[in-house]
Amino acid sequence: MEAFEKDLNVIISRRIADLYVLPFKNYYRLMAAEQGQLKLFKEVPQDYGCRLITYLKYRADMAVSEHRRPQLGAMTWHCGPEKVNLRLSSVGDYQGRESLVVRFIYQLTDDRYHLLFPEQWQELKTMLHRRGLILFAGPMGSGKTTTMYRLARELASKQVVMTIEDPVEINEPWFIQLQINDLAGMGYQQLLRLGLRHRPNVFIIGEIRDPQTAMMTIQAALSGHLVLGTVHARDAYGVIARLIQLGVPSYYLEQVMTGVCYQRLLMQTDGTPAVLFDQLNGTVLIKEVKKQQGRGMTDAWTHYLDQAVSLGQITPEEAAKYQNG
């Protein structure tokens, strides 16, 4: 048990988002989702992997004797003075070998959130002064939720902020946080309807992934709320295309869209990750909603990459890696 606790404490100290306990041949691989990439944390004997899964399932009130059917669980882990919420998901493969994914939900802190260009944050903050819809895109682990939470926290002392997520990724006492539970009939649409009756000032929608959720999000923005949300898109222009694909009429988007932000985490030369944004707002955004002609990254993205290289913030190789987003 001490070895398990040591591994988990190391994972928490590195602020790893997800731990994958995966069977591989005759042993287990512990994979860590860190800075948007899946990296090998360690390889362990099969017995260790099975015991780790059993230990965590027991702590999360999951059925330890069930190795094939999917299960969900939750627990709280204490790492020194810090309390971290864990969400667990297990399933067995056709050979009866069990795998487990653990999501670590941390308190929101600013010491690990670095901006490649702080002036971009100021530009984002100006969008908060208008009611409407601000959407974020970027790969898993690029910091979208952290960005939305930091923005909403700017308003939380004087306004009610409600989040709807699957699952909740950050523990934030200033917000009303709702979690999707499809088994209980509490999906995005149902919780959005509930939220509208609860009269928050600000909504955070974890993911807009179907036409019904997209239209309800638009309705929330039209009714005077500030709504922050995420969609799957490869770049800032793709956010608009994705909403159109989900059936949102462009005339609604013209009325509610306040900003679009695509973001990536880049590794700085000092070894710390930093966020770079590619943003659309104002007349540029409205023009894109009307014409939908944009493709790829904006000229500003390329400019910031070149500037970061010239200032020695990132290497030319790092810039080349993210040239296309």
Model-derived regions, located:
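Short, flexible helix-loop junctions that flank or precede catalytic/ligand sites
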Residues: 1-325
